[in-house]
Design a protein with these regions (language model features):
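Flexible "arm" and connector segments at domain edges
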Residues: 1-63, 67-110
Length: 110
């Protein structure tokens, strides 16, 4: 899976400087991080709704959309997939692979 995400990310980077009129990805990047973050949120909600309905194929399809939009957001913020993979490895070393890092007090993203 990591190879597929890296290929997706690299394809997004190739479109980053394209004319927005010629590429949906370039258009989304040109809209900026707020618009992309909104798309990420929308896709996450769609994954959750399909999961609640036990729609396996829907979850698969919407998960692919979510990963695409998340990769666009990463590219816009100059976050490479390996940065995320490194964080996953760090958490695995601290807490085990199936545990989420405890949230710090003080709000989201702090």
């Amino acid at each position: 899976m990591t190879d597929a995400l890296i290929r997706l990310y690299d394809a997004i980077l190739e479109r980053k400087d394209m004319d927005p009129a010629e590429s949906k990805t370039a258009r989304l990047i040109a809209a900026g991080p707020k618009k992309i973050a909104k798309k990420v949120g929308e896709e996450a909600v769609e994954v959750a709704l399909d999961a609640m309905n036990e729609d396996r194929q829907g979850v698969i399809n919407e998960s692919a959309d979510l990963l695409y939009n998340l990769s666009v957001l990463w590219a816009t913020l100059n976050i490479r997939p390996n940065d995320v993979f490194d964080e996953i490895r760090r958490r695995e070393e601290l807490y085990g692979i199936a545990e989420k890092l405890p949230k710090p007090t003080g709000g989201a993203g702090k």
